[in-house]
Design a protein with these regions (language model features):
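Hydrophobic faces of well-ordered beta-strands that scaffold small-molecule active sites
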Residues: 7-10, 64-66, 109-111, 196, ...
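Substrate-binding/active-site clefts of carbohydrate-active enzymes
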Residues: 2-7, 12-62, 69-190, 212-218, ...
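Active-site beta-loop-alpha junctions enriched in small/polar residues
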Residues: 14, 69, 114-116, 201-203, ...
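Active-site clefts of carbohydrate-active enzymes
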Residues: 283-305
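Carbohydrate-interacting/catalytic domains
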Residues: 1-65, 71, 96, 101, ...
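Active-site-proximal helices and loops of the catalytic beta/alpha 8
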Residues: 103-105, 129, 189, 199-282, ...
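Short catalytic-loop micro-motif centered on adjacent basic/acidic residues
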Residues: 110, 195-201, 300-301
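Short, well-ordered coil/turn segments that N-cap beta-strands
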Residues: 60-62, 105-107, 192-194, 220-223, ...
């Protein structure tokens, strides 16, 4: 699967493109369809993503994960239409042009798909509001006419986790499933998307995910499905019948927390529990989506108590098993915290142009290591995980496949450190050093403050 050898880059388009936070009043589907037939507009806000294509290609990005760009009430997850691009961003032709530009740069497109719920402005829900019992769409939702909603609709309905601006879809209704699958087909044929990120996949009907898996594989044999999951056993949905990957929130927490508490035992425990060589390790052979921040959680530059740990944190991210995903702007360390008057929008700012710095150059180096067609990339993308030396302030682990072994050494503090281990004997290619020289080690390895080293056994 191509995704297992790729660095992802996440863009939240409504924020990134500076769109208004609230949409205009809902319009009929046919009116959206008419606007969709217009020619591409080079000044459409969504075209900003295409303008970053050269930068993303140079950075080593192989896929862009685009959070919901479809017509919605406000933040994208309160969908009005699953068939057309949000008017605040542009039109369907504009998004098709964005996808074409990304593909021309060798970058695949994964769309954030919201199948668990829709917004109150969703066309079928508005029909129920108007026609009540007589609406042919009343069974598309979990509705009772024996009660009332907090909005006074004249009926009760189930919202997502108590958020009644998000109306839960009935995924056991064949008509709903057919509508969703037809929407996916249109995205694949009209935009050429290469995969989906499934919002709140942990809540989706399992039979629906099985059918989606079969349907998308028929569209494109290498179509990737990545689910949003928080806790629990990821094997329940990441398997041969459902999803290819899911978000690794366990290791997300372990990454920043290990640096903040100066306790590398935490992330080492999580990584071994998930990917280690013991029979009880639970995700061996799986490729989970790894990240240090995203559109729902504080930026790494804000959550780290020691900002000098940005570099070793990204070194850990790219060295551990999984699919690394960078959230736009974090590659040069922009801050962002939840709460305050802007709420989650503070995590989703408009950015005019890239502002690369030394951190960006380091992440670029890491991304290109992962995407290379060589032994080191195979070890980093597919190699087994093994802890070698664990200290509170330092961690040395191994990624090994049939033809390559890479040692990843991380120093989480502002003082030098010398590792000692039998695995540090022999010749190694110092992958992150200038010109990647071969070094001879005799059981010890020196690390500068906050340094990360990747050593390929020669």
């Amino acid at each position: 699967m191509w995704a297992y050898e790729t660095t992802f880059y996440q863009i939240y388009p409504l924020g990134f493109c500076g769109a208004p936070r609230e949409n205009a009043a809902p319009v009929a589907e046919d009116e959206l369809a008419q606007a969709a037939n217009a020619a591409p507009n080079p000044d459409a806000p969504i075209m900003k993503i295409a303008q970053w294509a050269d930068y993303l290609q140079e950075l080593g990005i192989g896929a862009v994960l685009i959070n919901p760009p479809l017509e919605s009430d406000s933040h994208g997850y309160d969908t009005r239409s699953l068939r057309h691009i949000d008017r605040r961003l542009g039109g369907d032709a504009d998004f098709a042009a964005v996808c074409e530009t990304l593909h021309a740069h060798g970058i695949r497109v994964v769309l954030d798909a919201v199948f668990n719920h829709v917004g109150r402005g969703f066309w079928a829900f508005r029909d129920v509001q108007e026609r009540k019992w007589d609406s042919p769409y009343k069974d598309w939702f979990h509705i009772s006419f024996d009660g009332d909603s907090c909005y006074g609709d004249g009926f009760w309905y189930e919202g997502w986790e108590g958020h009644f601006e998000l109306v839960k879809l009935n995924l056991q209704n064949p008509a709903v499933v057919d509508y969703l699958l037809e929407s996916v087909r249109r995205w694949a044929e009209g935009f050429g998307i290469d995969g989906l990120r499934l919002d709140v996949a942990y809540m989706l009907d399992r039979d629906f995910m099985r059918r989606l898996h079969t349907f998308t594989r028929e569209l494109k044999p290498d179509f990737v499905l990545i689910g949003e999951t928080l806790h629990g056993d990821y094997n329940q949905i990441v398997n041969d019948e459902m999803l290819d990957s899911c978000t690794n929130y366990e290791c997300y927490k372990g990454l920043y927390s290990s640096f903040n508490s100066v306790n590398m035992f935490e992330i080492a425990h999580s990584l071994h529990r998930q990917f280690g060589g013991d029979p009880w390790c639970i995700y061996r052979g799986k490729h989970l989506l790894s990240f240090v921040d995203n559109h729902d959680v504080p930026r790494l530059a804000s959550i780290l108590t020691d900002k000098s740990c940005l570099r070793p944190a990204y070194g850990m991210l790219f060295g551990m098993p999984g699919i690394p995903c960078i959230y736009y702007g974090s590659e040069w360390g922009i801050p962002g915290e939840k709460g305050g008057p802007d709420g989650d929008w503070a995590l989703r700012p408009a950015l005019d142009e890239p502002a690369p710095n030394e951190l960006t150059a380091f992440i670029k180096q890491l991304a290109h290591l992962r995407s290379a067609d060589d032994a080191a990339a195979r070890a980093l993308n597919y190699g087994a995980y093994r802890n070698v030396v664990i200290q509170n302030k330092q961690l040395l682990f191994e990624r090994a496949c049939d033809d390559a072994t890479v040692l990843v050494a991380v120093n989480a503090v502002g003082e030098p450190y010398a590792f000692g281990a039998g695995e540090l004997n022999g010749s190694f290619v110092d992958l992150l050093a200038d010109d990647a020289p071969t070094v001879e080690l005799t059981g010890a390895l020196e690390l500068a403050p906050y340094e990360v080293r990747y050593l390929l056994r020669a």
